[in-house]
């Protein structure tokens, strides 16, 4: 039995199955509630429900089989590409996947923070949580990309330009804040020193 359960798990698209189960469960709960409050229409609802069950039951497992097929196709493609893709690109994609896995947890933290403390405090908490993580992943990704051909040469041009425009943006935000525009006081300043330190040092 345990082998069958393990066989049912999808390697890449398990989130699709989980979303489907959640959607069906939510719809079922809503449907049962509506059915309970239908009052005199309940016998008609039961008749329609039996007809729908008769029609849907034969095709119920087709979407799951389609997702399994796509999952196996993705697995075959990934396995065949595994020997062709350079290790640097594999490393970058693994790090990107790791960042993507952290996203739902961060969103839940922010949502609970906004609910408990309000929007402004929630936004500050979001920035405080995201800034170190974003900086860490930017450095990791940058170092991995910097190993690819031509990236260091392009970086020598792009990094100074990014720093220049970041400083211009910061000047505009500071200026409009001093002039009394409240919206500007909520805009974050870009950390030009960090950009120069992280990306400039790596580019040279």
UniProtKB/Swiss-Prot annotation:
Location relative to the cell: Cytoplasm
UniProt KW Cytoplasm keyword: yes
An example Gene Ontology CC term for this record: cytoplasm
Main subcellular location: cytoplasm
Alphabetical keyword list: Allergen, Cytoplasm
Keyword Cytoplasm: yes
The protein, known as: Small rubber particle protein
């Amino acid at each position: 039995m345990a082998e069958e359960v393990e066989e049912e798990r999808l390697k890449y698209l398990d989130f699709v199955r989980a979303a489907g189960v959640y959607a069906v469960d939510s719809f079922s709960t809503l449907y049962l509630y509506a059915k309970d409050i239908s009052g005199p229409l309940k016998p008609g609802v039961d008749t329609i429900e039996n007809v729908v069950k008769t029609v849907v039951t034969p095709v119920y497992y087709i979407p799951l089989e389609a997702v399994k097929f796509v999952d196996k196709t993705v697995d075959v493609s990934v396995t065949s590409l595994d020997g062709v893709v350079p290790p640097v690109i594999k490393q970058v994609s693994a790090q990107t996947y790791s960042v993507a896995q952290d996203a739902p947890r961060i969103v839940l933290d922010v949502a609970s923070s906004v609910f408990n403390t309000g929007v402004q405090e929630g936004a500050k908490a979001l920035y405080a949580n995201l800034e170190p993580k974003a900086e860490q992943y930017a450095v990791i990704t940058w170092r991995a990309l910097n190993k690819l051909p031509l990236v260091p040469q392009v970086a020598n041009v792009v990094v100074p330009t990014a720093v220049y425009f970041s400083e211009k943006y910061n000047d505009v935000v500071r200026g409009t804040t001093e002039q009394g525009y409240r919206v500007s006081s909520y805009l974050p300043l870009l950390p030009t020193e960090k950009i120069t330190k992280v990306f400039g040092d790596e580019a040279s």
